Amino acid sequence: MAVYACSDLHGRLDLYKQIKAFLNPEDTVYFLGDAGDRGPDSWELIKTIYSDDQFVYLMGNHEEMLVEAMKDWLDYFHCGIAWQDLVNNGGAQTFEDWRNIPNESNQRIWMRNLKQLLKVKTYVNKDNIKVILSHAGFTPGTTAEINWLWDRDHYNDEWDEEYYSDIVIVHGHTPIPLMDIDGLNGEIEPGAFWYCNNHKVNIDNGSTWTGYACLLDLDTFDEHIFMEE
């Protein structure tokens, strides 16, 4: 049995299908959020990953925006700031596909499903390393939940080896070429990007526009790369 992490497929159902075909039946994938928006099959991918027993679906900032837009529509009967935020981030079609679900009770079921997604998860791997999984990553010692979904300011933070030597943080959220970190030149090389003395790793390959996705083995830290055909 292998345990993997993947993130930020953003509507790329084709890449999900490749990953699914690669997996053995007993494998598990922690999906670190942002299944929808921007890509061609966003709502379908959200439903598919949520319903897939091999995938542990964590919340991303796009799921959070979608839930807030759903709430505005169902409870206040209007498309407000939350909806506009979602649309500005590529979520117009995702929202419309959800809104076209027959019956308000079914719409509410999906709102509750996504609202209840976990924001952080810990996996202790075979080498007894604590692998902390969240959408955006963070620095140990920060406890604000918003960091787990939205943080983009932790890339050059110092790492306290004395207290956190046995921790690895796996995240997505910011496509690797867009990370504000020394040594990056804005070009994408498929795979995982390790930094912070190899205690943090970003696996967001910008799937929507690069056509790449990374599956990271959480025990061996081997990388498996998938690309559009």
Regions found by a protein language model. Give the residues of each.
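N-terminal active-site segment of His-dependent metallophosphoesterases
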Residues: 1-48
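Active-site environment of divalent metal-dependent phosphoester hydrolases
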Residues: 10-14, 37-40, 64-67, 140-141, ...
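Binuclear metal-dependent phosphoesterase catalytic core
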Residues: 196-229
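Conserved hydrophobic/aromatic beta-strand scaffold that supports enzyme active sites
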Residues: 26, 117-120, 133, 171, ...
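His/acidic metal-ligating clusters that form di-metal
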Residues: 103-181
